[in-house]
Amino acid sequence: LVAAAVALHLYTDWRKPIFLNKVEAEQNEIKRSIRLFKRRTDSLLGFLRTKKPIIIDINNGEQFSLEYQEIMTDLLDITDDLFTLLDNYKIILNENVHNHHIKFINKNSESLEKIFDVIGKFDPVIYYSLSFNLVYAELQKEEYSLLLREVIVNFPDGLTTFYKHISQ
């Protein structure tokens, strides 16, 4: 019986560092992806603030549309990667033990999904004009700045807080 208790203790001590390493690795990937998301979002917002399309630039293939399409395509790719990372991260968490953190992840995934619903509604290359008009109008709203703040600022802070909590 004592041997079983010692074995269980050693097994538990051995598993915790592996779990912490997995969490840390996944969180680092998520944070890296969030930084890329922030850069591309800043690029998009800066682009929308500083550049105004001339009537001829509304046509697909003009310099303005090409810049917009490049920014949007990168932003959509990064957002898709971030969704994948979040799904993979939730797999390593135990629903019974980390339920609060999983709810936090889901809340941020929902914020990201609301952003994606706007930026991904129309293909920025094929339906450039529709995409531009929708994104320009929607990102002016206060709701989207709050969603972006949630994903870009509060989400990484919550990940760090969770890691500090489980590593103690």
Regions found by a protein language model. Give the residues of each.
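Membrane-embedded hydrophobic alpha-helical segments
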Residues: 1-17
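Amphipathic, membrane-active segments
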Residues: 12-57
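Generic structural signal for well-ordered, non-membrane alpha-helices
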Residues: 6-9, 32-35, 39-42, 46, ...
